[in-house]
Amino acid sequence: MNFKKTIFSALATLFLVSPVLAELVFPSLSYRTGPYGPNGIPFADGYEDYFTLLNERDGGLGGEPIRVVKCETAYNTEKGVECYESTKGEGSLVYQPLSTGITYQLIPKSAADSIPILSSGYGRTSGRNGKVFKWVFNFPGTYWDAASIATKHAMDMSGGSLEGKKIALVYHNSAYGKEPIRTLEALSEKHKFELSLLPVDHPGQEQKSQWLQIRRERPDYIFMWGWGVMNSVAIQEAANIRFPMENFIGVWWSGSENDVLPAGDAAHGYKSLAMHAPGDNFPVYDDMR
């Protein structure tokens, strides 16, 4: 009798627990607060909305419901690591840290825990070497790709040669902003252009000294690795010194409406790289509406 009770108890527990075990857990390490909130909110909303769509339209993935576990990082590396530690035990399938600094810290942890990291267009560029970093995936592009593409565009604008030209890199003074430096230094040596490095401290509202230096040195091109308010301030400062906007090129994290609208018409001509098609003229948006 005791054996039968044990079997029935175990079966009852299994049926009670199995729906929970069947959930597909996707952690959302988002930042809706802090100085980068205006950039973090749209991504966090879109991430959650897409999984809501999959649940309501398709019944989840492969018949399994999706659960999004939210954790606020405020774009702070320490908080990001705390979010990882507090959510990985929920059966998290993949992490998107949304921060190069957080990504660097999570790479060894995720490898030890066998949990993939998807850092689309950010994070540790060398992580694309799958022989070394088996749990990191950073498609569709890296910051080394971006540095090369921006340089190629500047070269095309200069008639095929950058020899004797000056390029200034205005960058967020963080792991993210420093990612393209070694690539640009190598390209500078290869193509014989002069590279100047102008770091901007977090959050990026104060840039007077950097733009005074730009005004003094008169670079032919400016590349920007910015984020948040830093972008709009830089574009406005470029307009203030009448820098030719067509020669001002931002990475893909420096090309949203939030970045250009504050400068108004003065932003016309400014360019940024892109790793996705803009707009909402795609079938998935019809389903979400």
Q: Language-model features: where?
A:
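Extracellular/periplasmic Venus flytrap/periplasmic-binding protein
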Residues: 125-126, 134-241, 279-287
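Sec/Tat signal peptide C-region and signal peptidase I cleavage site
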Residues: 17-22
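Periplasmic-binding protein-like
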Residues: 87-100, 118-120, 166-171, 197, ...
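Beta-alpha junction/loop-to-helix N-cap segments that form part of ligand/metal-binding clefts
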Residues: 25, 38-45, 57-129, 139, ...
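Extracellular/periplasmic periplasmic-binding protein-like sensory domains
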Residues: 238-289
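Short, well-ordered beta-strand elements
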Residues: 23-31, 66-70, 165-169
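Signal peptide-proximal N-terminal region
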Residues: 45-68, 160-162, 189-192
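Bacterial N-terminal signal peptides that target proteins for export
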Residues: 1-10
